[in-house]
Amino acid sequence: MKRRSTAKAPTKKSQNDSLPRPFSSIVVDGIERAPSRGMLYATGFTKEDFQKPQIGVASTWSMVTPCNMHIDQLAVSVTQGINENGGKAVVFNTITISDGISMGTEGMKYSLVSREVIADSIETVVGCQGFDAFVAVGGCDKNMPGCIMAMARLNRPSIFVYGGTILPGELHGKDVDLVNIFEAVGKNAAGACSAEEVEAVAEVAV
């Protein structure tokens, strides 16, 4: 089976240094690409930025789930690191959904599909914009594999940054997490704890 690749990389380097610009040079170099540069000037590009490798930053930031609410801060750090080391960072977003919130409902039908949407959207932006490389920042069940799938499809320099594990909460001096909420629901069904006690765990566990 022939391996799929969305683009073939020419070999062109920056005029100012040795950093390669195999894809962005096609998009922005030359007099005929002035309209493209015009659009990018409007996003904050400078003349100097057009001589730098363009590095996409795929952010999965969302208020949908606590797993991703801090991703925008990590994307800022990634952007800073790229810009300080000779690249031009360009941040874009993709979606995320929460299995933990939608489980047991019709919403679960969208869970696995969302992985494909995430991979497709990252591949679409990176391929269309001509990024020379990209960094994907993810932190939830489906956006992490979605990011990795896009990296494999695009077959260009890329890094995945994991958003980290959610720290446990605390209740009555003990650590509690999402599993404890499920356990509390079970205890309530067995008559071993009240609805108020279940909610007390839910309020602090994540």
Q: What do these predicted regions represent?
A:
Residues F50-I55, G87-V91:
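Short coil-to-beta-strand
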Residues N16-S24, I55-S62, I95-K109, V126, ...:
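Gly-rich Lys/Arg/Thr-decorated short loops/hinges at beta-loop-alpha junctions or inter-strand turns
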Residues V28, E32, S36, F50, ...:
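Generic structural signal for well-ordered, non-membrane alpha-helical segments
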Residues K2-D49, E84:
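N-terminal amphipathic/basic leader segments beginning at the initiator methionine
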Residues A58-T60, F92-I95, V137-G138, I159-V161:
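Generic beta-strand/beta-sheet core signal
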Residues S111-V206:
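Active-site cavity-forming subdomains of large catalytic enzyme subunits
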Residues S24-V28, M69-V113:
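Anionic-ligand anchoring segments at beta-strand to alpha-helix junctions in alpha/beta enzyme folds, i.e.
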